[in-house]
């Protein structure tokens, strides 16, 4: 008995479904009767077809600075009215919508005019949705590669205004007019729509503006487009970690070149190593930035600034080494060099030279030596210095040395010596002269080395000052490069 009751119910449902299919088939036959997809859905030839153009942004895939192009994944939203596709739902079983292949109905052929790959087709030809009043909505997805003029001045602390221009490829403004879509409250939607649940964030860029505007040309009344302005700002963390921080560390190495003693022999090696490393970084960046002469990226400016400083560090190191290895045999030290680099600058550069030797103690008054002078006697002049005395005895001379000194430094103009002492005195005077010359040589050579150390320290502080001020000025300038309040140019 239960089976006998179920069969009529099943047959009734099948009959209703068959009738519904028949109604939809009848509706399709009705709307496509005498339908021509090549004819605009206008009642009169001079009537313009109003097409609403909107866009849902799904993903900013990439921005190629080298090729100056923006790759995005979007859903283009188009809506218009085609009275030829209207029907009365009551006559067709209450059907409120109809899905039709886009190839079977008229479409406004809206395309991305500034595409960069020559592909004007959509990624997928989805069906259009038709309402009983003839309203047609179409949301085809697309992977667009649009041209984007890259402003490289503040790269990588930059923002870019990449526009996407949509217009009808074959129809002018007198046949098809483009307008912004409207929301449920009837208000125009003048920006690209983003659904947070489906939008994919980009790891390198963040969207700041996504407004749209209808543009027309006063010189061409048939021109009309809807342009979406995507203002995107770069996230510079990658470049800070991989480029800027290494450059700063290399600059610090170049600073320590001036702290390295010239005798170490590695000043030039370290300077040239830093210069070559910065050159490699510059070559790596050359593959990233666009080949344009309209501007120089700020990161390239910083690299050039750093390379200039490192180049000067090489030059300054050569100067320091040249000063360090000078000697009295090759160079004479001018008085102004002594005054500036030995007596004046060191106290301002935090350099203190070891204390000089303590001066000799004052000797007691010389003894009076009297003797009888003859015409044929040998006379010698009083020595002008005491360098014939041993150096260790300068401060504590023994009595014999003092007696000899008093004997030689008597008040008389000359002393009569026996002939057997003439050769001994001559040898002593020769030794004293040689010791004096050697001490003068060593003193002047040490003065040149001290001048080299002072110049090295001067270059160190100068390099630190220029590096700090230059780095701060460059990156503070980039810090003020903020996206505009309005995206429209």
Curated annotation (Swiss-Prot):
* Secretion signal span: 1-20
Q: Where in the cell is it found?
A: Postsynaptic cell membrane; Cell membrane
* Alphabetical list of CDD domains matching this protein: LGIC_ECD_nAChR_B1, LGIC_TM_nAChR
Q: Which residues lie on this side of the membrane: Extracellular?
A: 21-235
Protein topology in the membrane: Multi-pass membrane protein
Which keywords appear in this protein's UniProt record, sorted alphabetically? Cell membrane, Disulfide bond, Glycoprotein, Ion channel, Ion transport, Ligand-gated ion channel, Membrane, Postsynaptic cell membrane, Receptor, Signal, Synapse, Transmembrane, Transmembrane helix, Transport
Q: Which residues are glycosylated?
A: 135, 161
S-S pairs:
148-162
**Record's function text:** After binding acetylcholine, the AChR responds by an extensive change in conformation that affects all subunits and leads to opening of an ion-conducting channel across the plasma membrane.
Its name, as the record gives it, is Acetylcholine receptor subunit beta
Source organism of the structure: Xenopus laevis
